[in-house]
Amino acid sequence: MFRTITSRLAFSVRQAEETVKPRIAYAQRSGRRIKEKVALMQAKRKEAGETGAPEKPGKFVLKTGKGTRDYGPAQSALRNSVLQTVTETFNRYGAETIDTPVFELRDVLMGKYGEEGGKLVYDLQDQGGELLSLRYDLTVPFARYLAMNKITNITRYQIAKVYRRDQPVMSRGRYREFYQCDFDIAGQYDLMLPEAECLGIVDELLTKLEIGEFFINLNHRLILEGMFAVSGIPAKDFKTICSSVDKLDKTPWEDVEQEMINEKFLTKEQTGKLGELVRFRELNSDLNNLELLEKMSQLPDLGQNDKFKKGAEELKVLIEYLNVDGVTTVRYEPSLARGLDYYTGAIYEAVAPKALEGTAVENSEDTAGQPVGVGSVAAGGRYDGLVKMFDSKANVPCCGVSFGIERLFAIMEARQKVAIRTTQTEVYVASAQKNLVRDRKKLVKMLRSAGIKTEMALKANPKLLTQFQYAEERRIPLAIVIGEQELKDGVVKLRNVVTRDEQTIKLDQLITAVRDTLAAL
């Protein structure tokens, strides 16, 4: 009886609560909160690669993974030409090549890229064995290779793909899977000679690739540490403040200063002093590199700082070597502050801010609505302590440079004015009549055996006009035409595909004639 009364009472209370609903109090911020939640949901969907309305259950969207792309014949041909130029340049500087696994032990990569870089490493799913991650760059695997094989002296290059969980912007060559081309010098050498080699390669290679105007920013870790010290910034805050300073190439000083004050708790006095130093190039744009370093050395506090003095003297030696080499694209930039999780000396970065001027993507925007730019196309520096992270007894000083080949490719693709050939075919063998497929094949075999790149139509009786059109579309320089009468006379017609001029050549002189004609083109 008691239980029945209690149940009825509880039901009456619930009914009353549902009938008389409490008045909703709307906060002024509720609308903003809803917008923030919607924006967050949209950001998560974008991160997951979703676009538009959600797909129906079970429907498969055929596409490449976010931050990756396919390369068709034209793009592959252009990229291969870039890689060939890179390889030839590296070989000219006496480098050997190595290859390392696409994935490394997770412990090899962790702790080498700082807090932000570490978040971008792709971890592989644990299969009950070793914990593995995809390589983030080629430098740390190279240091692991040196330590593991007890190598103390090598000049090496490596061209391979790396992987980063970055926010991709395809139109400016920013991907999650991309090629890096690294050149490094490991070993005990005299001051700044390896750095001069690395910067010489950057200058030579970017000039050859014709990406437009570029310059190479140059700084030194010790100079940065000296500037921070005289600004009253504790050594423990070095890396976190450097991450703010490094934004000066894209962000006004006022915004960077507010970030350091509001988020990193520097005082106005500290940021004021630091701002004068890191913007020294901007405030003294009429001075050359040596003059700029000399003027900074004359500042009362900075000129007496031991770290600054050592870094400045080393850069002066490097700049003098570059002057001897005729490298004029290097620019001393006190605000350059990248890669400081393992760089110990000189640091440098090549940028091409006007590379996309006059191209179709010049005024385009990325997915976040920001203007599309290319960013750095090469970067590097000295990293004397990286090998020691793997072997405490190893003392292998290193310096090097890494080229972002996808960014260079994006520039060249945007600037490309002439269609690039997708094959290397030199000769196309055509027939003017039917039933000559065997004779065409004999000619193709003869030419290929002589080392001449040759094609023919893979049809028994192709039309002559169709064969000529194919050769013209593929920009094959020469065509060899055979007919019944030519075969009886032991001759062929050698045709210039561009000019359409033809000459009759004896069959036993064909190889020599083809080689001479190709050499004259």
Curated annotation (Swiss-Prot):
GO terms assigned for molecular function: ATP binding; histidine-tRNA ligase activity; identical protein binding; RNA binding
Gene Ontology CC terms, in alphabetical order: cytoplasm; cytosol; mitochondrion
The keyword Lipoprotein belongs to this UniProt entry's keyword annotation: no
InterPro entries to which the protein is assigned, alphabetical: aa-tRNA-synth_II, aa-tRNA-synth_II/BPL/LPL, Anticodon-bd, Anticodon-bd_dom_sf, His-tRNA-ligase, HisRS-like_core, HisRS/HisZ, HisRS_anticodon
Pfam family, one: tRNA-synt_His
Residue numbers binding L-histidine: 137-139, 164, 180, 184, 338, 342-343
Gene inactivation effect: RNAi-mediated knockdown results in gonadal defects including smaller, narrower gonads and reduced fertility with either no oocytes or no fertilized eggs in the majority of animals. RNAi-mediated knockdown results in an increase in the expression of gpdh-1 independent of hypertonic stress.
Catalytic activity as recorded in UniProt: tRNA(His) + L-histidine + ATP = L-histidyl-tRNA(His) + AMP + diphosphate + H(+)
GO biological process: germ cell development; histidyl-tRNA aminoacylation; mitochondrial translation; nematode larval development; translation
Disulfide bonds: none
Keywords: Aminoacyl-tRNA synthetase, ATP-binding, Ligase, Nucleotide-binding, Protein biosynthesis
Enzyme Commission designation: 6.1.1.21
Gene3D superfamilies (alphabetical): Anticodon-binding domain, Bira Bifunctional Protein, Domain 2
Entry function: Involved in protein synthesis. Catalyzes the specific attachment of an amino acid to its cognate tRNA in a 2 step reaction: the amino acid (AA) is first activated by ATP to form AA-AMP and then transferred to the acceptor end of the tRNA. Required for germ cell development.
Protein name: Histidine--tRNA ligase
Organism of derivation: Caenorhabditis elegans
